[in-house]
Amino acid sequence: MRAPGSGRLALPLLLLAVVALAEGDAKGLKEGETPGNFMEDEQWLSSISQYSGKIKHWNRFRDEVEDDYIKSWEDNQQGDEALDTTKDPCQKVKCSRHKVCVAQGYQRAMCISRKKLEHRIKQPSLKLHGGKDSVCKPCHMAQLASVCGSDGHTYSSVCKLEQQACLSSKQLAVRCEGPCPCPTEQSTASTTDSKSETCTGQDLADLGDRLRDWFQLLRENSKQNGSANSATNPAGLDKSLGASCKDSIGWMFSKLDTSGDLFLDQTELAAINLDKYEVCIRPFFNSCDTYKDGRVSTAEWCFCFWREKPPCLAELERTQIQEAAKKKPGVFIPSCDEDGYYRKMQCDQSRGDCWCVDQLGLELTGTRMHGTPDCDDIVGFSGDFGSGVGWEDEEEKETEEAGEEAEEEEGEAGEADDGGYIW
């Protein structure tokens, strides 16, 4: 027999079951795949949603490596939760239609294309799951330092670059530290462009005149602005500068010589920033450095702009211009002193010959030899610019010696008379 009132209880229970079933379907619809356009899936939404959880916009070109970095970052933020090694990390990961979820360790999961997966399965040495033998090693937050890869892309760390190389089966290397493009690429391109420009002999000859006119213009502008007398020249500058160098050329030297040592080094010469307009500016100043010591003295600076240069410096400039124009190796290069005149000894490095000259460069007969002649004994300098061999006249020498002997005899006779002999 049926208990009384059982039919009344069955109807409410049936209704409750129907309502629960409907709620379960609705919940399953929310948690499962969204019906309709598959592009509305969470996996295609931009990674901005992974930071805020609210802002979401369409972005089908997501970086797999960067997504992996974000997931690892979220996993690290959940450090309070105990690590559950029984759960598969791919349970909550949804991949696109042509990709498969692959677990790496207990907390990491990545979406890899089916073709790459099949390619890795064919290679027995590779393992898909994390471990000591895993090729695609995990990356940690402590290793973040952006680098530029050989493929032209910027990676958040070297580990990310190696991981991308592992995933894409490509050979990638670090081109430089920091984001792309590398600074060396830009500097190399500019250096190549500057080296492509060649300076002819006429260019070097005309550049000195243009610089002199430019210095004169700068000095006139400085006078008008009242700053010409603000910077006084060093005490030794006026003494070291020649008479023809105390105009705009000497004024420019005092402006450039910030150290006050009466020399212009490469840093001080770099203040004349005309490389963009004068491609021969550096070769010109290199030709001024006759000593090749990396700096330009006051004399070298003045001689660079002299219309009439001393003989040795003039020949040196002609030789350098010929080398720049024709590029002839083995050309004799004269050795000049600080005043622009020839040194006593000149040597041809290509032949190994050395000889003695005067200050005007005239070779003294019989002094050329293999080795180093003693030009100090051969050449006698008199005055500032005169030179010549110390020839002696034997007849005059004998006459002078005879006169000296007669004077000595007379002196001895006088001393004898003082003795007081009585005849």
UniProtKB/Swiss-Prot annotation:
Region entry Disordered, spans: 387-423
Cross-referenced SMART domains: KAZAL, TY
Leader sequence segment: 1-22
Keyword Translocase: no
Subcellular location: Secreted, Extracellular space, Extracellular matrix
Family matches, as CDD domains: KAZAL_FS, TY
Domain Thyroglobulin type-1: 309-375
Statement: the UniProt record of this protein carries the keyword Heme: no
Domain Kazal-like: 130-182
Keyword annotations from UniProtKB, A to Z: Calcium, Disulfide bond, Extracellular matrix, Glycoprotein, Heparan sulfate, Phosphoprotein, Proteoglycan, Secreted, Signal
Main location: secreted
GO cellular component, one term: collagen-containing extracellular matrix
Carbohydrate attachment residues: N225, S382, S387
Comp. bias regions, Acidic residues: 391-423
Top-level division of the source organism's lineage: Eukaryota
Pfam entry (one): SPARC_Ca_bdg
PTM: O-glycosylated; contains chondroitin sulfate and heparan sulfate.
Sequence positions bearing Phosphoserine: S72
Role summary: May participate in diverse steps of neurogenesis. Binds calcium.
Alphabetized PANTHER family for the sequence: SPARC OSTEONECTIN (PTHR13866), TESTICAN-2 (PTHR13866:SF18)
Protein name according to UniProt: Testican-2
Organism per entry: Mus musculus (Mouse)
